[in-house]
From Swiss-Prot:
Record protein name field: Ferrochelatase
Annotated GO CC locations: cytoplasm
Source organism of the structure: Acinetobacter baumannii (strain SDF)
GO BP, sorted A to Z: heme biosynthetic process
Gene for this chain: hemH
Its EC number(s): 4.98.1.1
Main location: cytoplasm
């Protein structure tokens, strides 16, 4: 590399993934890849193969495709949001980092824009440094770790390796907590304050937590910090976990059960925030916003509202870009002194 060339740096913003279409075949392809990852399902491979292929994939894609169709526009909501996040973070970082030839790329763990394909493209263009920002605020072996696995598989195939930074998570970053609190206040300024604010996170099986996955504890820290930022009393908010799958115990309390209990106790108004999601997707727009509203109201509850994810809010873009910028500043210092 000549001294006149700018160091080439690629930033990867990675989310979970989404089907290509809201159709049964597309959903089946996506679910097969997702649910075949041993990071996601920790069941002996042969036993899980039978369950997946005989009891899950023949039935679940039809129900899921119908759910996807209810939230689909011209594309998957998650993919549209991740594209916009990528473009806006790129504009921010280009403005602040003239010293680098800098590119920001979207990636998904599963489905199209897969992390493996993104890394393969980098092989043709040697990089000075690669920064991976998983868009999972709270680390889990079920979500963030598969991205580490992708890099571990890619690294032995490369001769001229780049420097590599992986931003593990940001569950208690002050800008993250502030952005969440501001999103709640902005929503309540328009729609009023409820009796209860529920912070509902995607769940994981309890045995995963027992074996050392820090996810649930990090979710609890996020929720507590948001509640403190909002000056909420203990009886004005709660944390719960949604989307349990199968018959084993998952981390508790369960979102659906808590909402029904509240309704039976006479709680009439609830707003739900899901700080585990950096982009709205099927789970937030259909399960949280629609299914759980029906559960709450059928059990006797009244007003129910889902507060959107941070998505492409300016405070969120500032957070994501800021996380990367801190590493670019360190890289600038390193390159200047080597």
């Amino acid at each position: 590399m000549s001294f006149e060339q700018k160091p080439k740096v690629t930033v990867i913003l990675a989310n979970l993934g989404t089907p290509d279409e809201a159709t049964v075949p597309a959903v089946r392809r996506f679910l097969k890849q997702f649910l075949s990852d041993p990071r996601v399902i920790e069941i002996p491979k042969f036993i899980w193969w039978i369950i997946l292929n005989l009891f899950v994939l023949p039935f679940r894609p039809k129900r899921a495709a119908h759910a996807y169709a209810s939230v689909w526009s011209t594309d998957s909501p998650m993919r549209e949001i991740v594209f916009e996040q990528t473009q806006r973070v790129q504009a921010y970082l280009e403005r602040e980092n003239k010293q680098f030839d800098l590119t920001v790329l979207p990636a998904m763990t599963y489905g199209n824009l897969g992390i493996d394909a993104v890394l393969e493209k980098l092989s043709a263009h040697p990089q000075e440094h690669v920064i991976l920002l998983p868009l999972f605020p709270q680390y889990s072996a079920t979500s963030t770790a598969p991205l580490y696995d992708a890099f571990a598989k890619w690294i032995p195939t490369q001769r001229n390796l780049p420097g590599l930074t992986i931003i593990k998570d940001y569950y208690q970053h002050p800008m993250f907590i502030q952005a969440l609190a501001e999103s709640v206040l902005a929503y309540q300024e328009q729609h009023g304050k409820p009796e209860k604010l529920l912070m509902s996170f995607h769940g994981i099986p309890q045995p995963y937590a027992d074996k050392g996955d820090p996810y649930a504890d990090r979710c609890r820290i996020t929720a507590k910090l948001v509640a403190e930022a909002l000056h909420l009393k203990d009886d004005e908010w709660a944390i719960s976990f949604q989307s349990r799958f199968g018959k084993q115990e998952w981390v508790k309390p369960y979102t659906d059960q808590l909402l029904q209990d509240w309704a039976k106790q006479g709680v009439k108004s609830v707003q739900v925030l899901s700080p585990a999601f950096s982009a709205d997707c099927l789970e937030t727009l259909e399960e949280l916003a629609i299914q759980n509203a029906e559960l709450f109201q059928q059990a006797g509850g009244g007003s129910y509202a889902y507060i959107p994810a941070l998505n492409s809010d300016q405070a969120h873009i500032d957070l994501l870009a800021g996380l990367v910028q801190a590493n670019l500043d360190a890289l600038t210092h390193t390159l200047a002194h080597r």
